[in-house]
Amino acid sequence: DGETLVAPSEMALTLSTGEVLGESPRVRSARRRAVTETIDAPLYRQSRFDAAYNELDLRLRGDYGILARAYDDGVCYRFYTERDGELTIVDETAQLNFEGDPSAYIPYSKTEIPMRTSFENTYEYAPLSKFRTQTVAFMPVLVDLGERGYVLYTESDVEAYPGVYLTYDKEAKGFAAVSYTHLRAH
């Protein structure tokens, strides 16, 4: 409906070489397309469903890019590279910022070592400004924007990657990803 639900938010990947994909990005090309496809889903309540989305492929200097998709009820993005060989990601910047102080359903890690969790927990409902800073949360997190709807913040396709935990960035007024590397260092 043309309404902004998420404030400007940063995203980047830091590689083991020290290079940061997403830092001062320079667009080489942008390609847009509208897609409608049928997806086979043998384990879903229906065996097939249609998905329609608008896609933006930003190719950036440095042989990498960001692929973003906007569906009727959600958006997603992913980094990709056009480089040969393997890359090692040592850190991730993934913010999700909001105007004002909306409330959210947040599952906090309640273990002494935050990354040792079964990802099962009760969700606490509170304004983002009341985010418990002495611990981290895990995904998904559901942000309540009142009559404007909800924003669900989650990750997908996590294989051979430790996943992301969340903390609250008071200055940016939103969630900031905390990687396994940061948690392990403390």
Predicted feature locations:
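Acidic, contiguous internal or C-terminal segments within carbohydrate-active enzymes
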Residues: 49-100
